[in-house]
């Protein structure tokens, strides 16, 4: 997090300004004194020209009179001259000159100039970047009670810039600034209480400091408060409060708040679902470069308006920022030639970008492509590696495919025990192919003791999800009473489902089962199947 921005408002003159008539009188008096070389009068006259108080505003004349006062060593004027040089007011923007005048005022102990000089050193503007010098000048201003400098000192200790990282010292300076009501320091102090860095974790205290900052209009604090209300984290879950705080931050251009408002309207969380409102917030956030918002706009154009050309524009913006979900979606568009000519190599390029960042679907899809040689040379070892990466994220299809490759005698690492372990992990997540594979293993006693009851259970889990071969095997077991009770009606039901799915041999088994059934039972089960189908 960078230091807080430099001060930009000129210091006030000591002249009284109450009405236009008095301004004119002041002007005449000050002008006479200024022309005689009175530095304070020159400074006050510069202030009047800067603000257009009683006279026509003129940055050029403000610069002139500030310059005369500054040349006489008046620190207020030196500071204001530095501000005008830094902002390019009445003169071409010149950080070198700004640093020169800040230095003059800072060496006289002027805290605001010390702060701004520290900021220029921190940013390397007009001076060589020097964290040590930034630290020095922030320290001098902070010791005079300047809250912004105290906050920036805290940040330098926080990040180890110019000093060894020291969370305790960071908190010390944040607290000094926070107790003066400095919103950014209040927020930073809240973050430390939230994370328990340099202080005993106290999330209630964290929330209290964040609220103080939020109520002063500090957008990151408003966003954090909204998150707490949205998720019921520390604060009671309250969608209305969450939306209110997101709106306050979003109104200040806080991109993550704009994005979260888009999500809320997109999903109808605490408000009626409103896709147009969601899009409006996504557009605001995306316009500020928010990658997730750009990705969601891409999804809208792809799946809503089916404008693949616009979709790829937004995906590309997010993908260029390294957003893995957008990289994956861009790969899909290249693969299928949607919104652009199909290009297998570009698809693989973007899949790999996403996969390298841990995008589980991209890892799985790369595994498939290396297994089957789609867009890349076939390489079962690489296929296994990508499946393994996705499997480690508990992605059940990858766990299953990892098992399949370990099961292959011609695979890169044949290991039937490892295959069985992979199937178990996938099956526990409800993956029907893995459940069927475990059913077969228990049915045949492969790597596990033969156990028809266990086979029955695994087949049943897969069959209920529509796995046709599991339906066939379960039907055969029910017809023979193997692993479970002999039940011809259940056998007929499962075999009928297998027949409907076109499983070889199922129709013959169904006829054989029907031949063993009583006519009344056969009528009843056929009526049951008709009712299900109808």
Model-derived regions, located:
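Terminal, low-structured helical/coil segments at or just beyond the last alpha-helical repeat
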Residues: 2-4, 504-534
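N-terminal segments that cap or nucleate solenoid repeat domains
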Residues: 2-51
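Hydrophobic face of amphipathic alpha-helices that form TPR/SEL1-like repeat modules
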Residues: 44-51, 80-87, 116-123, 152-159, ...
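Predominantly extracellular beta-rich ligand-binding scaffolds that present long acidic/polar faces
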Residues: 439, 475, 486-488, 494-495
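Short helix-capping/linker turns of helical repeat alpha-solenoids
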Residues: 22, 35-38, 51-53, 58, ...
């Amino acid at each position: 997090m960078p230091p807080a921005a430099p001060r930009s408002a000129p210091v006030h003159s000591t002249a009284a300004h109450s009405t236009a008539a008095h301004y004119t009188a002041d002007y005449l008096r000050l002008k006479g004194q200024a022309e005689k070389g009175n530095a304070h009068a020159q400074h006050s006259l510069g202030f009047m020209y800067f603000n257009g108080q009683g006279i026509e505003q003129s940055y050029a004349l403000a610069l002139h009179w500030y310059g005369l006062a500054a040349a006489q060593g008046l620190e207020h004027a030196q500071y204001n001259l530095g501000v005008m040089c830094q902002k390019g007011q009445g003169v071409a923007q010149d950080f070198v000159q700004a640093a020169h005048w800040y230095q003059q005022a800072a060496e006289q102990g002027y805290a605001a100039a010390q702060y701004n000089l520290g900021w220029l050193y921190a940013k390397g503007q007009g001076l060589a970047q020097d964290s040590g010098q930034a630290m020095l000048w922030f320290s001098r201003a902070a010791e005079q009670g300047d809250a912004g400098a105290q906050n920036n000192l805290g940040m330098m200790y926080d990040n180890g810039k110019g000093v060894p990282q020291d969370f305790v010292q960071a908190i010390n300076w944040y607290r000094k600034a926070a107790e003066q009501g400095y919103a950014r320091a209040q927020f930073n102090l809240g973050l430390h209480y939230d994370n328990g860095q340099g202080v005993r974790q106290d999330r209630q205290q964290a929330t209290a400091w964040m609220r103080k900052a939020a109520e002063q209009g500090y957008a990151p604090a408003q966003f954090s408060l909204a998150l707490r209300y949205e998720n019921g984290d520390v604060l009671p879950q309250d969608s209305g409060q969450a939306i209110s705080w997101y709106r306050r931050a979003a109104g200040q251009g806080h991109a993550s708040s704009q994005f979260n408002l888009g999500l809320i309207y997109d999903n109808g969380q605490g408000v009626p679902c409103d896709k147009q409102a969601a899009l409006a917030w996504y557009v605001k956030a995306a316009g500020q470069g928010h990658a997730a918002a750009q990705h969601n706009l891409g999804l809208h154009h792809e799946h809503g308006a089916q404008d693949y050309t616009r979709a790829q524009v937004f995906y590309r913006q997010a993908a260029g920022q390294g957003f893995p979900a957008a990289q994956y979606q861009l790969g899909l568009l290249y693969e299928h030639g949607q919104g652009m000519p199909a290009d297998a190599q570009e698809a693989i390029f973007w899949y790999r970008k996403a996969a390298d960042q841990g995008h589980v679907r991209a890892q799985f899809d790369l595994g498939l492509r290396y297994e089957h040689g789609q867009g890349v040379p076939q390489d079962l070892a690489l296929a296994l590696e990508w499946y393994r990466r996705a499997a480690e994220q508990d992605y059940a299809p990858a766990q299953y495919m990892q098992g399949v490759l370990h099961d292959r005698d011609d695979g890169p690492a044949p290991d039937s025990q490892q295959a069985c372990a992979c199937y178990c992990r996938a099956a526990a997540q409800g993956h029907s192919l893995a459940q069927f594979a475990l059913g077969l293993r228990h049915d045949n006693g492969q790597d596990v003791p033969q156990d028809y009851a266990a086979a029955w259970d695994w087949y049943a889990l897969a069959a209920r999800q529509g796995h046709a071969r599991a339906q066939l095997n379960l039907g055969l077991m029910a017809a023979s009473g193997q692993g479970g009770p002999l039940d011809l009606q259940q056998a007929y039901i499962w075999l009928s489902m297998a027949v409907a799915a076109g499983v070889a041999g199922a129709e013959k088994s169904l006829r054989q089962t029907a031949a063993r059934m009583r006519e009344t039972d056969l009528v009843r089960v056929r009526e049951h199947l008709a009712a299900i189908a109808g």
